[in-house]
Regions:
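Sec/Tat signal peptide C-region and signal peptidase I cleavage site
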Residues: 25-28
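Extracytoplasmic/secreted envelope proteins and their assembly/folding machinery
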Residues: 95-102, 153, 157, 178-182, ...
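Aromatic-Pro/Gly-enriched surface loop or interdomain linker
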Residues: 30-137, 141-144, 250-251, 257-360, ...
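Loop/turn elements at helix/coil->beta-strand transitions in domains of secreted/extracellular proteins
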Residues: 78, 133-136, 162-165, 239-241, ...
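Surface-exposed patches in mature extracellular/periplasmic domains of secreted proteins
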Residues: 112-121, 169-171, 192-198, 288-293, ...
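Short alpha-beta junction capping motif
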Residues: 137-178, 360-401
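N-terminal secretory signal peptides and thylakoid transit peptides that target proteins
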Residues: 1-17
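An acidic, glycine-rich "communication" segment
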Residues: 76, 177-257, 264-275, 306-309, ...
Length: 501
């Protein structure tokens, strides 16, 4: 195959990182290309010169000359592995995409990350040998439809559960790849969904703050440029989006070229969004590793009939994003109070027969819970009959806050959430609380709890700021919430108030 000069390719294509419009790739770059490739090869890694003393083959008294030998730069920490899958070159549609993206990350963020190509068979062999891959992220791209084997699905599933991330891009916006990827995600995680990320998701503010991007599509021979909110899809495991997918082409933009077909982000936006994706994965790496291990908390099985039982509501909005922090909530209650605690958590559906036995209900999540009218009726009757519901906004995102307010308006149409004043009994039920601390800055911040009253009793307490996940001292770095000490005291007071009233 004729070797493509990268500089010539880019000049002829008229590409640049901040470009807003690009013509078709040159014809000579299309000729003789292996199946699946639509971009030039990656640039050669740079070398540096290091001096070394040497004696030239000259008779004395010649002055010794200094000669230099090339030496490669030390390898940066590995961030992404580009997956080799299938039987064609379709996995490598843009050979220079990740290499170029890492250069932009280094330039913009000041952090140098490495990448490598990795056969999917290597990942399968690793997990079949009961080992783990320590690569933070795997990258998948292509044009054509594909299908994983059961062994490949099992390895990828375990990799994600172990704290890894999967980043996927439909090159040129090809629906064949997009549909196959969605089907594979569904096969790996049948009970979870790949949902469009809300604009307040941290991936859109992890480095560059995004509200709109530039899209390019083609209707026949007509080019259509539009501006709109970015479109990324994610699937959560714990408090992070472990799978991130773009149905709009990013890889051609990372590779600094474009084509007059398909659907894509313009290269400038593709590169900036790519920097955000890498920044998000890097920032959530510690959280991913902590949440990959679920800890069981147990205690003496004393006073069983008097034990406090926490029943967690199941719903459609990612109802159990962080099992470790829920277990830590129970551990906190047991360690600071004399309350007998049942450590076996009880997941329950919002059905009258399921929740009737549990006076204290706990709810958290990320997305719209989508309770049915029948489920809302069961919850309403339960709270009117003496039950209690504590709702915590996991990570404190605005999207879940909107959904909870909508849920409460349907649950109690004649009432609304009201801010609990500083004099409310809840803030004195165990600890005397006047203010909290922010988990990011450590600065003082008000305790913002809201509730719904029935007569003189608050039956529903809602914290729009995360009051639970930082109990384990590691939480979403982009989250909005209280520090560990405030979380501990606040949840203790909520439980104490519920038990006393």
């Amino acid at each position: 195959m004729k070797r493509i000069n990268r500089r010539k390719f880019i000049v002829q294509a008229g590409a640049a990182a901040a470009a807003t419009g690009l013509p078709t790739a040159p014809a000579e770059a299309q000729v003789g290309r292996k199946l699946g490739t639509c971009g030039p090869p990656p640039r050669k890694n740079p070398t540096r010169q290091t001096s070394a003393e040497g004696m030239p083959p000259l008779p004395l008294p010649a002055v010794p000359l200094r000669r230099s030998e090339p030496k490669a730069e030390p390898a940066p920490p590995l961030m992404i592995a580009k997956l080799e899958y299938g039987t064609t070159q379709d996995w490598n549609t843009d050979p220079g995409d990740i290499d170029n993206l890492m250069r932009h990350v280094r330039s913009a963020v000041g952090l140098w990350y490495g990448w490598k190509q990795m056969p999917l068979a290597e990942l399968v062999a690793l997990y079949q040998a009961k080992k783990e891959s320590k690569v933070p992220a795997l990258y998948l791209s292509g044009h054509e439809a594909f299908q994983f084997t059961p062994q490949e699905r099992a390895a990828l599933t375990q990799y994600l559960l172990d704290g890894g991330s999967l980043l996927a891009d439909a090159c040129c916006g090809r629906s064949e790849f997009a549909n196959s990827f969605r089907a594979e995600v569904k096969a790996m995680f049948p009970r979870r969904s790949l949902d469009r990320l809300e604009l307040d998701h941290p991936v859109f503010r992890s480095f560059h703050k995004y509200t709109t991007v530039n899209f390019r599509t083609f209707k026949g021979a007509t080019r259509v440029d539009t501006v709109g909110p970015p479109e990324l899809y994610g699937m959560n495991l714990g408090c992070r989006a472990a799978i991130l997918f773009s149905p709009w082409d990013l890889s051609c933009g990372w590779d600094e070229h474009s084509h007059e077909h398909g659907q894509r982000l313009l290269p400038g936006d593709a590169i900036r969004l790519g920097i955000n994706l890498v920044s998000y994965i890097a920032a959530l790496r510690q959280v991913a590793e902590v949440q990959s291990v679920t800890r069981e908390v147990s205690g003496k099985n004393e006073r069983k009939r008097q034990q406090f039982v926490l029943a967690q509501l199941r719903h459609h909005g990612d109802w159990d994003p962080d099992p470790n922090s829920t277990a830590q909530l129970l551990r906190t209650i047991a360690s600071v109070s004399s309350l007998a605690v049942a450590f076996d958590q009880k997941p329950v559906d919002a059905k009258e027969t399921d929740i009737a036995r549990f006076p204290f209900l706990y709810m958290t999540g990320f997305r719209d819970p989508r309770f049915s009218g029948e489920e809302l009726g069961a919850l309403r009757r339960h709270l009117q009959a003496g039950g209690f519901l504590f709702v915590n906004n996991c990570s404190g995102y605005a999207a879940f806050d909107r959904h909870i307010r909508d849920m409460v308006s349907k649950l109690f149409p004649d009432q609304k959430l009201e801010r609990l004043g500083a004099e409310h009994r809840l803030f004195r039920s165990f600890y005397t609380l006047t203010e909290g601390r922010d988990r990011q800055s450590g600065a003082a911040r008000p305790l913002e709890l809201e509730g719904v009253r029935i007569r003189d009793r608050v039956v529903l307490v809602y914290s729009k700021n995360d009051a639970v996940t930082h109990l384990k001292l590691v939480s979403d770095p982009f989250g909005n919430g209280y520090d560990a000490d405030t979380c501990s005291k606040l949840v203790t007071n909520v439980v104490s108030y519920a038990m006393q009233n």
